């Protein structure tokens, strides 16, 4: 993640609303500690709230329609490093733990954040850009750009400003198809010490000590002595050496495993709201989002067409590791809500000529 001193950065989405003042992680021994972003701060006694999704507003931070006061929150990156609140940016995907959500008379929801975990999907060199298709390729993974993808200050031209060889950090969602949908892309203009890839393990070869994430071949031979529990179908966060081995495989320097893509809090009774893709589907009443089992049997009106590959927002309560839903909505990039930012703060000056 690129450090920064102020927020928000110049915006690259289609509109801005300005308002006036008003774990599921399984650790590999010897491969580091902590969760991917983490969910500390929600008690195991069944109190508090948890939400996971892109930052869509400031004035504190707005995630999934909830305004979280982040003044006292602990902010960490998915590698466990402490971050400043000023490092948070629009489009970054975060896991937020905090107090119970309250709803004002005008319908606005708010809570106090205790921890904010930031997680990106890919960090590495761009090997291809397809402007016509709206995609780029990073570490062998195809990344889809949408009209709502946010680009950082160094990429104000959007996808047209991205060049082959540039090292970028991609925030967003892994789709069941293996393609990544980008909610934000940062240009890593400072030298990096490693690359990073998050995805689902496949093609595990324990003899060769390799596996794949998408099309990328990863070798864990250098850290094999500390690796245990690796299996196909697991979610993995892999830090990679900057150069591949002689066979072309990317060399892992650390691996972190999880059963889900989102580091959900432990305990029952926590109110949770998550955004992601349906990764498994049994029926309208039972499916998984980012590996998290959802029980939607009590939802009065479900959107038609629920299926693997649909992006949804689910709100409910955690019980026995299952998210018992009380609402399920599609979350598509052509929704009007996704075309807007929300900024709240004190107006310090007004330019009549600029309007």
Where are these regions (language model features)?
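Short, flexible, surface-exposed loop segments at domain boundaries
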Residues: 2-70, 78-355
